[in-house]
Regions:
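Active-site/ligand-binding neighborhood in enzyme catalytic cores
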Residues: 1-57
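Active-site rim elements
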Residues: 14-19, 100-106, 259-262
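Amphipathic alpha-helical segments that form well-ordered structural scaffolds
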Residues: 23-34, 114, 272-279
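Short, well-ordered alpha-helix to beta-strand connector turns
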Residues: 35, 77-78, 250
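A structural signal for the hydrophobic beta-strands that form the central parallel beta-sheet
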Residues: 39-41, 82, 255
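Conserved beta-strand termini and adjacent loop/short-helix elements that scaffold enzyme active sites
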Residues: 42-44, 61, 256
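Mid-domain catalytic core of redox enzymes
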Residues: 46-199
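Conserved flavin/dinucleotide-binding core of flavoenzymes
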Residues: 153-309
Length: 309
């Protein structure tokens, strides 16, 4: 199979699911603000080397033009935490910084298409009777006879995972392409949505759509008044594994994303952050008492009992 049993149970454990009004991202924003840490926005770590005064030297760069920063600043730390998959971080590791480079694991390449249109979903496309109302959320599944092990064709003839009607909106007057009420849609798919698909799904005259839908970003039409595509490596394929990444890649170098190949959720990654924070404190206490120890099986990993399926 392409997913292990425990992750399957996690996917089915939706009872009591909640969200924050305005977006779950606010949880992590407030976590960061409550920490009183120095937060460097629009700044990325470009490389990690062995330090001279401390264990690690981090080189960073600004992601926006900034004349005031003509050089790449370097800061040294005794402990560092990499809280992103290394394979997507664009961070270069110096020689002998870690004992073993984490394995690259395959991620789902998810195409998210957000757009506005006065049109509604076509009942005909879904085999409904003329005039039948289409639900606000459409989820697809594969036919029983389809080979679901083929990662290149995991949605079958439907061509998408889901379509959601997010809200209804009325844009400010003065924009000819956005006159009247608009429906805001979101499509999840394994490949870019094509003009032919959009035409069939929403009963839009094909000749009114450009061959490349990305042209709608700059040139919206009366049928598609706003268009925003985004590609995410959204979550990993949770294949059954017998080994997993270490939490501590080297002495004082912690890696929360080792959890990704086991279970990939916000909650479990937050729990991993809690575990890493505890390990950092434990290591400092041991160092103060005259010991030096990297992560071993004897170190207590907290929170395991809190993982409920």
């Amino acid at each position: 199979g392409i997913i292990h049993g425990l992750e399957t149970m996690v996917c089915l454990a939706v009872e009591g699911a909640m969200q924050i009004d305005g977006g779950n991202w606010q949880i992590f924003e407030h976590m960061a603000l409550a920490s009183n840490a120095t937060i460097l926005l629009d700044t990325a770590v470009s490389s990690i080397e062995r330090g001279s005064a401390r264990k690690y030297a981090l080189n960073s760069k600004s992601l926006v033009p900034n004349p005031a920063r003509r050089t790449t600043p370097t800061q040294e730390f005794d402990s560092i935490v990499l809280a992103a998959p290394l394979q997507f971080s664009n961070i270069k590791l110096g020689i002998d910084v870690v004992k073993k480079i984490p394995d690259e694991i395959p991620y789902v390449k998810l195409h998210v298409t957000l757009f506005a249109s006065p049109n509604t979903l076509s009942g005909k496309y879904f085999g409904l009777k003329e005039g039948a109302e289409v639900p606000d959320v459409v989820l697809t599944t594969t036919p029983p006879d389809q080979d679901t092990s083929d990662e290149n064709d995991i949605v079958g003839k439907a061509g998408f995972f889901s379509i959601s009607t997010l809200r209804y909106a009325v844009f400010a007057p003065g924009n000819d392409a956005r006159d009247g009420p608009q429906n805001i849609y979101k499509i999840f798919s394994p490949a870019p949505i094509t003009a032919d698909q959009l035409s069939s799904l929403f009963n839009i005259e094909r000749s009114t759509l450009p061959d490349n839908l990305n042209d709608l970003v700059e040139k919206p039409t009366a049928q598609v008044s706003w268009f925003y595509p985004k590609v995410w490596y959204s979550y990993p394929y949770e294949y059954p594994r017998v080994t997993f990444e270490r939490i501590e890649l080297a002495d004082g170098f912690y890696y929360t994303s080792g959890m990704e190949s086991f279970i990939s959720t916000m909650e479990t990654n937050a729990l991993m952050g809690k575990n890493v924070a505890r390990l950092i404190v434990d290591d400092y206490v041991l160092e103060k008492e005259g010991f030096s120890q990297t992560e071993t099986e004897e170190q207590t990993v907290i929170g395991v009992q809190e993982l409920k399926i």
